């Protein structure tokens, strides 16, 4: 009987992580009921998805061929124990808590780059608390809910937002710990007051004369960046509501994002454009 018990325990831990070697994709069943998917794109680019559902929603950015998906394989190692899973490349290591899904990132020398990245469901009080702050700030900017996004069947244009965030039951937050003195840049042409965004709340949704060309990408002075892979309305609270936390507020109950790392900020920008594509340089006579 004991042998059968130990065999079942071993099978449980072996089945908690499935890796597709060629694509370098890791499917992780978290103990809190969420499903996580980690894709190693390069030595320094990781795509991470989290959902409370049995399957992951297809990104419209992927459906329409906007983001890169044909990544070349890189050497990856994976360790699994009772508490956490480690996914490592030649340059960086992700440690994932098997219960909560909290992720910490360090380089191969052991220097911690991001102490904690964690997905919060709508049940977390922060979703309502931060949502109220967002709705108060942008109360005069309500628009049809995703009405201009071709292919978004979940929210037809006839549906109107009652609040900027929509229903609190269908939101989520990606919570990222911040270091003292860490600074952030990016976001495109959005609801910004400064070029440096630490301490600001940004609205990532195109609205005429308000947020013209938002880009849900942020780069840190610590040489890492994050791209929120969504066409849904979202908000970046970069240490405004909580001084030591970067909260990405999504108006959906799942997350799809890229973490990227480099030895310099230009390296991180290079990673970002590798994901989204690079603009073509026009000939001299075009200027």
Task: Label each region the model flagged.
Residues 4-13:
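Sec-dependent N-terminal signal peptides
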Residues 19-22:
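Boundary at the C-terminal end of the N-terminal hydrophobic targeting segment
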Residues 28, 32:
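Carbohydrate-binding surfaces of carbohydrate-active enzymes
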Residues 33, 43-45, 100, 223:
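A generic structural motif
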Residues 36-38, 215:
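Hydrophobic/aromatic beta-strand elements that line small-molecule binding cavities or substrate pockets
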Residues 39-86, 122-127:
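A low-complexity, Ser/Thr/Gly/Pro-enriched, surface-exposed linker/loop concept
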Residues 80-285:
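Catalytic and substrate-binding clefts that recognize carbohydrates or anionic sugar/phosphate headgroups
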